[in-house]
Amino acid sequence: AKESLFNVLNNRFDFDEIRVLDLFSGTGNISYEFASRGTVDLIAVDQNRNCTRFITATSEALDAGIHVVQADALQYVRRASTSFDLIFADPPYDWDHYEDLAKSIIDLGLLREGGEAILEHSDQTDLSHLPGFFAHRRYGHVNFSFFSRPQDLTEEDLSLIHISEPT
């Protein structure tokens, strides 16, 4: 699923020119993938101290320059003072605040012009009714919902809103 996601993103972004926020970063796999593709403006947020220590140590060993923050992801988003080109979030599948997170990202202006937020979730979560939603992709049991600033969505984008299962 990660490789397929990055194939999609590779067609939309110049990784070395974007600011990325990785929420619920866990052991940092998504952050390392962005760093390996040239992203230098990268923030990884996780609440677990062991995870943030691991990401910090790994980032230093790889000279990846990832800025690591130990914080609750939703609280971090609500207090963020900067905007991002790409926000990736992989909360636990049983997390109760997917809608709050998506709405906060859009309502608080955390996406730059042309920016996207991607939330990973289970089959049981449907975020397609939320403002800024424009696509859903499914890779096996892994689901990604894509969001952008509503003002960035064109009529063509809105007509393309879809749920897809790539083969």
Predicted regions and their residues:
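Class I S-adenosyl-L-methionine-dependent methyltransferase catalytic core
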Residues: 1-160, 164
